[in-house]
Amino acid sequence: MSSASVERIAIHGPVGTLDAHLAVPAQLPGNGRPGIVVAPGFPAAAGGGANSFRTFPGLVERLASDARLIALTVAFRGLSNSAGHFSLNGWRADLEAALDRIKEVPGFDGSLWLMGFGTGGAISVSLAGDRDDVTGVIAFAAPADFQDWASRPRELLSHARRCGAISDPNFPGDFSHWAKELQGISTVSSAAKMAEGDKKLMVLHGGNDDAVPALDARAIADAHGSAELRIIDGARHHLRHDPRAIATAIGFLDRRGRPVQVTEPR
């Protein structure tokens, strides 16, 4: 039996209602618990494929039950039943709305964490670099930047239509502006800004990731300087489904990003 309760909630986002799930530990201490917002990645196929948002309520339930965190996951615009259509800056704004929402949950103690997968991981690092209220980030399979998309914006637009992240044939109204947003987020630069603010960072990546090279993970970790980097042997891109990656992340959260204490042999 889970020691956490999960409820589906609506978040008032910048362009409409965002589908979200909130998980809270069964018993909260008087001084409260930290909060974590979980950001999904870009859909792999129609309905989400391996990145389907349908799997994320189970993840926040586990974070609330095992790590004793107040955990919230949000479907960005264009995903699940959320209003709107995909744009990179739009997803970033949606994540900001989720961060503001978790602060309203009774029992939140003020310590705010982010966990993101793929594009969601990159956006999480980007926000953490700019916001003073974020304690740390766990980024799974995050790209170092979006230059690959920026070099092929029409191909990305076609994929977004196929997978349902954009359902309006007239969107975007200004294609050049939509495409230019892809050049505006650098995970590497944001990781360096996180370090300046003394914010914790764990970077996890699959050793056999065929979507984002593991070199991107190393670049992000190097830019931060003291990030914990974990390359999961044999794992591919969708680390949401790799129990080793999730267990490693929960361990990091349990110690709140503090370095592992190694006892010297006597």
Locations of regions flagged by a protein language model:
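N-terminal cap/lid segment of alpha/beta-hydrolase-fold proteins
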Residues: 1-30
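The alpha/beta-hydrolase serine catalytic core
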Residues: 18, 134-219, 223-231, 235-236, ...
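Short, surface-exposed "cap/lid" segments of acyl-processing enzymes
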Residues: 27-66
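Glycine-rich nucleophile elbow surrounding the catalytic serine of serine-hydrolase chemistry
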Residues: 116-126
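Alpha/beta-hydrolase active-site loop
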Residues: 85-106
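Conserved hydrolase catalytic core segment
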Residues: 126-136
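Conserved alpha/beta-hydrolase
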Residues: 58-81
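Alpha/beta-hydrolase fold nucleophile elbow
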Residues: 106-118
